[in-house]
Amino acid sequence: MKYNQQTLNRLEKVLEEASYVVRYERGSFQSGYCILENKKVVVLNKFYNTEGRINTLIDIIPHVIIIYEMLTTDSQKMLDEIKFQKPAVEN
């Protein structure tokens, strides 16, 4: 997976198609997702660079409820890529 703006846009699209709102806010907080008054919201730190945003979304997406059939084909492929990717091995 490439760490560029196109990948970030595709990840955001997966969440948007699953009825989540992706917001970028400033502050010293951990990125994450929450449900506020039945509204699905994913909040990311706006000071993260593109790679940080992508990594955060990759961490979040497996934990949110996404109805696979509601996604477009492109988003289904992206979701499959996230769910079935092997974790990076650190040396």
Predicted regions span which residues?
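Short amphipathic alpha-helical patches
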Residues: 13, 34-42, 80-88
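Active-site scaffold of zinc-dependent metalloenzymes
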Residues: 26-51
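Auxiliary, metal-adjacent structural segments of Zn-dependent hydrolase domains
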Residues: 1-30, 91
